[in-house]
Amino acid sequence: MYENGKIYMGLAGGKRVELALNMCNRHGLIAGASGTGKTVTMKVMAESFSDAGVPVFLCDVKGDVAAICVPGQSSEGMEKRIDKFGLRDRFVYQGYPTTFWDVYQEGGHAVRATVSDMGPELLSRILGLTAVQEGILHIVFQIADDKGLLLIDLKDLRAMLTYVNEHRTEYMMTYGNITSQSVAAILRALLPLEQQGGELFFGEPALDIRDWMRTAADGRGMINVLDCVKLAQNPTLYASFLLWMLSELFEILPEEALKRYNPKVSDPVKVDFDNEA
């Protein structure tokens, strides 16, 4: 619960346990055995961030977070907790502004990225390529860039790999050695990603990650819920999404630490995210 600029987390030894918003950019871990309230704790934090006007992103692996968009219902256990934590005079059941996302486009808005946006480095990590294979993938991306070709989806990447392999003798003097064996290995490595639904993730229109940094009309932060019930069962595609998301955040979010050591850096807008994967 958000009160007086802090998130009221609970009680310990009769004293309130609170989380100050200016400390929320630290990494955190919610741990505990089954049934001890990990998901409830995460939901309380998400709701509190929203009340503070901070957009939230979280992954719903079990499918039990979606109800955050509708008001809860009273129960005997809930009434006891309201009294225990001294919230009787100010607690109200309410829904929160929520946007649902789904890589598989079944339980929410589509989440897409282009192959060009992903880049050869991230793709190589996702596909588990060797150093030689990664080098060839860099060559393929460079040739596409030199020719002004955008790699939108996995079909584009396959077509480009096939094209480079067929014309490798023309490019070897400019870009370096290209072997058909390595190209074939990259094509094989694409199969698991395609089978897990990669054709749904890679494509257009690509998601602008700034769409997750919105507030509702009443000033509360938007809670963005990614449906991961199916996605978590497909680790290659899940890793693709997470690596892409982190790289996008690293690219567009300002670095607060720069201001401390460089007074010429302009004052950036600060956005806090709560992410449980």
Where are these regions (language model features)?
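N-terminal pre-Walker A segment at the start of P-loop NTPase domains
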Residues: 1-17
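Pre-Walker A adenine-sensing motif
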Residues: 12-21, 212-214
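Pre-Walker A (Motif I) flank of P-loop NTPase domains
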Residues: 15, 23-28, 220-224
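The conserved Walker
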Residues: 30-34
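Conserved lysine of the Walker
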Residues: 38
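Post-Walker A alpha-helix
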Residues: 41-42
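P-loop NTPase motor domains
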Residues: 46-56, 63-277
